[in-house]
Amino acid sequence: MGRVFLTGEKANSVLKRYPRANGFFEEIRQGNIERECKEEFCTFEEAREAFENNEKTKEFWSTYTKAQQGESNRGSDWFQFYLTFPLIFGLFIILLVIFLIWRCFLRNKTRRQTVTEGHIPFPQHLNIITPPPPPDEVFDSSGLSPGFLGYVVGRSDSVSTRLSNCDPPPTYEEATGQVNLQRSETEPHLDPPPEYEDIVNSNSASAIPMVPVVTTIK
């Protein structure tokens, strides 16, 4: 019998029960066999020990096994998804990395070819299409074309000839008719100046006689 059964110390050294994370919650709310079997896997013997009745145990066991089969079927579907999704995602990441490496390698290769050929590629946003100048047009040292200079010179000559052909505007004296008066004032006087007696006599003759006013004081 000693070979079949172990003592308490040896049994505790082999079989140990560790407290669960929700041990404090189990102390507050005492569980039953149904909740424990739903949360964990239990056997028929554990259910019979809990119910202590074969009929109740069989009834519980039939419903419990059916529920376990349904959950296992749903879990198998999700298991396929969990297995294939990481594989597809990892394959997509690998292809993306390979594509980026290939693009970088191709860009460096084209850049090296352009440098060896002596052509420096310009950025695309700086490319400006400019029409080439006509072959017969030659620019002088000032940067202006002869056609433009001829146009400027011809225009200035036409303006100067137009201004030379025009008569100057009349003066103020000519416009107001005071030219003869000004000329007569500037010409030298031929007659001698009048005498003093003539000036006095002419002033006295032109004077108006004044009538004396007599005022009487009362």
Swiss-Prot record:
Entry protein name: Transmembrane gamma-carboxyglutamic acid protein 1
PANTHER family per record: COAGULATION FACTOR, TRANSMEMBRANE GAMMA-CARBOXYGLUTAMIC ACID PROTEIN 1
Region (Disordered): 161-195
Residue spans, topological domain Extracellular: 21-80
Organism, as annotated: Pongo abelii
SMART domains assigned: GLA
Keywords recorded for this protein, A-Z: Disulfide bond, Membrane, Transmembrane, Transmembrane helix
Keyword Transmembrane helix assigned: yes
Record has Disulfide bond as a keyword: yes
GO molecular function: calcium ion binding
Origin organism lineage: Eukaryota, Metazoa, Chordata, Craniata, Vertebrata
